[in-house]
Amino acid sequence: MRRTFFKAKIHRATVTHADLEYEGSVSIDEDLLEAAGIWEYEAVHVWNITRGTRLQTYAIKGERGSGIICINGAAAHLNRPGDMVILATFAELEEAEARDFKPTVVLVDRQNKIVAKDAVEVPGPARRVTA
């Protein structure tokens, strides 16, 4: 049986742009995409920590090293520059491959620069990233 598992996330990224006129998607700095193992055009959940909104779109490559997180199209109504978001992906896995699977967690600072990768998720305030 296949089950859906959390695959990767870019945690507490800062929205740098919101482009209502673009067709759709979320532009993500290519360095962040690679670190998280997220492919261009892969489905991405955008969970807005600041506003409490959630949506699903797809990733496109943003300029490498720029720190860009640009919410495009109609989703720009739900996300604004300065908002903090979690960008997450999921994967369907067979039971055998799921047993040893570990998701990729990329932590970023307020400029969307990587501060940790493959972090172990620990609930509670001790886990907060304030860099």
Curated annotation (Swiss-Prot):
Ligand binding (substrate): T57, G73, A74, A75
Post-translational modification, as annotated: Is synthesized initially as an inactive proenzyme, which is activated by self-cleavage at a specific serine bond to produce a beta-subunit with a hydroxyl group at its C-terminus and an alpha-subunit with a pyruvoyl group at its N-terminus.
Pfam families per record: Asp_decarbox
Catalytic machinery residues: S25 (schiff-base intermediate with substrate), Y58 (proton donor)
Keywords: Autocatalytic cleavage, Cytoplasm, Decarboxylase, Lyase, Pantothenate biosynthesis, Pyruvate, Schiff base, Zymogen
A GO molecular-function annotation: aspartate 1-decarboxylase activity
Listed EC numbers: 4.1.1.11
CC cofactor: pyruvate
Lineage: superkingdom: Bacteria
Catalyzed reactions per annotation: L-aspartate + H(+) = beta-alanine + CO2
Residues recorded as bearing Pyruvic acid (Ser) in the entry: S25
GO biological process per UniProt: alanine biosynthetic process; pantothenate biosynthetic process
GO cellular component: cytosol
Intracellular or extracellular location(s): Cytoplasm
Cofactor: how and how many bound: Binds 1 pyruvoyl group covalently per subunit.
CDD domains named among the record's database cross-references: Asp_decarbox
Similarity annotation: Belongs to the PanD family.
Physiological role: Catalyzes the pyruvoyl-dependent decarboxylation of aspartate to produce beta-alanine.
Subunit record text: Heterooctamer of four alpha and four beta subunits.
Entry protein name: Aspartate 1-decarboxylase
Organism for this UniProt entry: Anaeromyxobacter dehalogenans (strain 2CP-C)
Gene field: panD
